[in-house]
């Protein structure tokens, strides 16, 4: 069945197929890809140390992509549902003051990716009033965004 949102953080992050797909995609086009955000699993930072870092810095987008302009890129993956934590959205709102944010979303059900500007993600959330859930390991609340909505969105 694979990894799900019910698995521990350590298991969820052990192998991130969405980041693999993002790197493959950006390395195949004419752009510069720079790893930017903190990767707790590969940084050597303990969970205790990681929690001492201010939230907005912990939630730094994963990459900078430079083509005709610079974008901060947040990579997200899932099967049928994209889960976006409420607190992460607060941080992304702050990051947009410095650089536009683009989401690279990979669905294992669709077996494809879509790039969608952060503003479109927020519009989808507000337009559809998606239900929320909580991660069992940390009780953090998240929106449940159907991948179908992301992949059929023509403006993203």
Spans of model-derived segments:
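Active-site metal-binding core of divalent-cation-utilizing nuclease and nuclease-like domains
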Residues: 3-12, 35-69
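A short, highly charged nucleic-acid-interacting micro-segment common to nuclease
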Residues: 1-24, 29
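Conserved catalytic cores of phosphodiester-cleaving nucleases, focusing on short active-site segments
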Residues: 26, 61-79
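A structural signal for short, well-ordered beta-strand segments and their strand-loop junctions
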Residues: 34-35, 72-74, 102-106
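Intrinsically disordered, low-complexity terminal regions enriched in charged/polar residues
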Residues: 115-156
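Nucleic-acid nuclease catalytic cores
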Residues: 93-124
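Active-site-adjacent loop/helix micro-motif of nuclease/hydrolase catalytic cores
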Residues: 79-89
